[in-house]
Amino acid sequence: MKRFTSMVLAALMILSLAACGDSTVTVTPDATPDSGSDAPAASGTAEYTIKVGHTLQEDTPSHKAFVVFKDEVEKNSDGRIAVELYPNSSLGSERVMFEACQMGTLEVAYGTTSVLANFDKNLEVLDLPFLFADEAAARAAVNGELGEAAAANLSEIGLLNLTYMENGIRHLMNNTRPVNTPDDVKGLKIRTMENPIHMSAFTQLGASPTPMAFTELFTALQQGTVDGNEQPIFLIKTSRFEEVQKYLSLTGHFYTAGIATINKAFFESLPEDLQTVVMDAADVAREAQYGYCDEDNISALEYLKTKMEVNEITPENHQLFVDATAPVYAEVEAEVGPEIMAIVRAAQAG
């Protein structure tokens, strides 16, 4: 339960929330949950209901992992908890769902730490460019001391870290040219998430970062509003970006962790035995999601190589990208302080 430890004053959290914008916190009342599995629905007789909202499609590793979560919770609670899954942005954007989870109108919200960092600056450290060499290193770090420190303040704003998952290592696409060096990025208008670290990194590379909701991205690429975007391999395929992007460069510039938050008051209202059921189910779902990601990334990359011009980055050119984005580390340290950055450097060192 260390992941739930509070580390900062509530006043600081209020300031963080003030930066979250004016998104309306709504949960669509007539959204239909995805049944997810063949397990019998228990909501009619259950003592508790956990609604889980996320933005991804039903065939993604994350949704499949939440099907596992649903099955584990309903089975091991003997039907005392029913789980309803709401994929595909049916309850709104990531930010809207995190806010709904904070307010208690949604029990569990899943999204990227990149978006949740708008609520808690410490989570920004997980978005640093070229932070991890590969998924194995990233998973070890976010499920260790670094991930614990990054999410420790969430309890001050009414959330708890149920579990980390992942969107994965991100790569760059565009319709102008292959990207081999930082010079190739200059002048490109790249859609980014609404995340200052991502935007700063692309600015350092000479691009024009353009934050945009994921739901608007495909149309923006079709219309040429932006030149390119960046996503994990499996998500490129499931979102059909090969239909609107010509070049895929395996830059590996960010690792995007996913995080499932649970409303603190709701979790603490559960009897201790059911708290354990929920936490254990989240652990099982996380490991399942990592496995699904590995499988999907392999098959998706093979498919994308038949649809796009794909290039790898040489070690020498990779270092050029690392050097070009190094100033972002100083920017983040000024935001979060040296203590958590020391944990970042220890995680990088392995």
Across the structure, where does each feature detected by a protein language model lie?
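Positively charged n-region of N-terminal signal peptides that target proteins for export
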Residues: M1-F4, L9
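C-terminal motif of bacterial Sec signal peptides marking the signal peptidase cleavage site
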Residues: S16-A19
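N-terminal secretory/targeting leader peptides
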Residues: G21-A31, A42-A137, L146, L154-G350
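Glycine-rich, low-complexity intrinsically disordered segments
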Residues: D38-P40
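Conserved glycine-rich "GG(E/T)P / GGGxP" loop and the immediately following alpha-helix
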Residues: A151
